Amino acid sequence: MIGGNTTIISGAINASTEAPGLGTGGRAWPVLVGVVLGAVVLSILIALAAKCHLCRRYHASYRHRPLSSAGGGNRPPVGEDEDDDGFIEDNYIQPGAGEMETTGSRDHFSL
């Protein structure tokens, strides 16, 4: 019985000491190096384009182009609303309610 056990153990040791093949993870390093190199090259190209101002004329042409007059059809003409004083009115504070409190507080705390 002892002889049979030794052959099984020696077979297990030989199977675990073999080097892994290319299919089990040997190709992971070249892929990782390729991705890192691609990212570095892309960032260098973007930095060079920014430093050399390659896109400046395209950016300037968008900045200095006048707006088209076709898009302004939904705006009301200037001077149409006479009540527009520049303040946003919500109905949380009623108009005129603050004026009465200020006059009453002045009479109460007059010096």
Swiss-Prot record:
Topological domains annotated Extracellular: 1-27
Keyword Transmembrane among UniProt keywords: yes
Membrane topology of this protein: Single-pass type III membrane protein
Cytoplasmic side: 49-111
Bias type Acidic residues, positions: 79-88
Record keywords: Cell membrane, Endosome, Glycoprotein, Membrane, Signal-anchor, Transmembrane, Transmembrane helix
Transmembrane segments annotated in the record for this chain: 28-48
Residue positions with a glycan: N5
Localization per record: Membrane; Early endosome; Recycling endosome; Cell membrane
Region (Disordered): 64-111
Pfam family, one: LRR19-TM
GO CC aspect terms: early endosome; plasma membrane; recycling endosome
Primary subcellular site in the record, as a coarse category: membrane
Tissue and organ distribution: Expressed in stomach, kidney, large and small intestine and kidney.
PANTHER family: LEUCINE-RICH REPEAT-CONTAINING PROTEIN 19 LRRC19 FAMILY MEMBER, TYPE III ENDOSOME MEMBRANE PROTEIN TEMP
General function of this protein: May be involved in membrane trafficking between endosomes and plasma membrane.
Protein name, as recorded: Type III endosome membrane protein TEMP
Organism expressing this protein natively: Mus musculus
